[in-house]
């Protein structure tokens, strides 16, 4: 099966701008990244997207691809395929050969950045609103203290692999209709490291790393919300060959509150009123995350009426002020009435106490919706 067209892979037209190429690449790279997408073919699709972007994001490579496609320029001044063996460095490096890479191999001993780590932290409602300072312990791969990360028993050292001579790759020559081709593959004797460890460290078993519980201090900013994450630079797994450490990403989960509901920076709650309070009006103390606040409820207040207390919501996590607290009224229907109370209600009903305006009936559901939209 032939290779797919690069423009098709990225879902763009041949006239696409560099901004469009970059935008579609980022979207697809996030979609198929093996750390996010666990489907069996995700890694292959991610590699395919990356390869397409590497060519189309480079104006020179893109022009050559538009002219020659996957077959390459062949005899158009690039040396062709005939004659001596051409070193392609494996199929993944074919475009390096065509577009200036010259079949360069990767140095197995080059510094490599460590893996990123993810930690899920569960906060109480108030902790998310006000923030906190805390320490967490996470298991992470650290350089082995016994062998200083070499993987070799103290007093010994790794040796250069005699099969790949330290390159980490083996060359396999094949005869093709185009001539002899050298295909590179990872050295199976040293697993691509370029080193052999005759005497392995007893502590780490030759890996050069051990798992340790590491205490890390985390500053939770005020106003953080469910699903947001905090990046702690350099607190991921250790790098290899002197490379930098990865990062730690702390993903936030927030426990539900019994009384408050949060939407963005705004906080919502429901305030129960008796018939008498709703009809006659009242002044009540209402709880907020910042303390109690007095609210005047005017006479004739209906279920669904909302009041806003400005600035009593959650602080914006980026420091852009505070949200508001929205209070939705709920008039409670009594369920356990004494005979005297029932008689009084019947008398009230006979005096015309059951009259209500059409406007009140029509708008009650509109007010309910507005309350949850923060209007």
UniProtKB/Swiss-Prot annotation:
Zn(2+) 1 binds at residues 144, 147, 201, 204. Binds 2 Zn(2+) ions per monomer. Keywords: Chaperone, Cytoplasm, DNA replication, Metal-binding, Repeat, Stress response, Zinc, Zinc-finger. HAMAP family: DnaJ. GO terms for biological process: chaperone cofactor-dependent protein refolding; DNA replication; protein refolding; response to heat. Coiled coil: none annotated. A zinc finger (CR-type) spans 131-213. GO terms for molecular function: ATP binding; heat shock protein binding; unfolded protein binding; zinc ion binding. Residues 5-69 form the J domain. It comes from Oceanobacillus iheyensis (strain DSM 14371 / CIP 107618 / JCM 11309 / KCTC 3954 / HTE831). The J domain is necessary and sufficient to stimulate DnaK ATPase activity. Zinc center 1 plays an important role in the autonomous, DnaK-independent chaperone activity of DnaJ. Zinc center 2 is essential for interaction with DnaK and for DnaJ activity. CDD domains: DnaJ, DnaJ_C, DnaJ_zf. It is found in: Cytoplasm. Zn(2+) 2 binds at residues 161, 164, 187, 190. This is Chaperone protein DnaJ. Belongs to the DnaJ family. Its cofactor is Zn(2+). Disulfide bonds: none annotated. Participates actively in the response to hyperosmotic and heat shock by preventing the aggregation of stress-denatured proteins and by disaggregating proteins, also in an autonomous, DnaK-independent fashion. Unfolded proteins bind initially to DnaJ; upon interaction with the DnaJ-bound protein, DnaK hydrolyzes its bound ATP, resulting in the formation of a stable complex. GrpE releases ADP from DnaK; ATP binding to DnaK triggers the release of the substrate protein, thus completing the reaction cycle. CXXCXGXG motif repeats lie at residues 144-151, 161-168, 187-194, 201-208. Homodimer. One of its GO terms (cellular component) is cytoplasm. InterPro entries: DnaJ, DnaJ_C, DnaJ_domain, DnaJ_domain_CS, HSP40/DnaJ_pept-bd, HSP_DnaJ_Cys-rich_dom, HSP_DnaJ_Cys-rich_dom_sf, J_dom_sf.
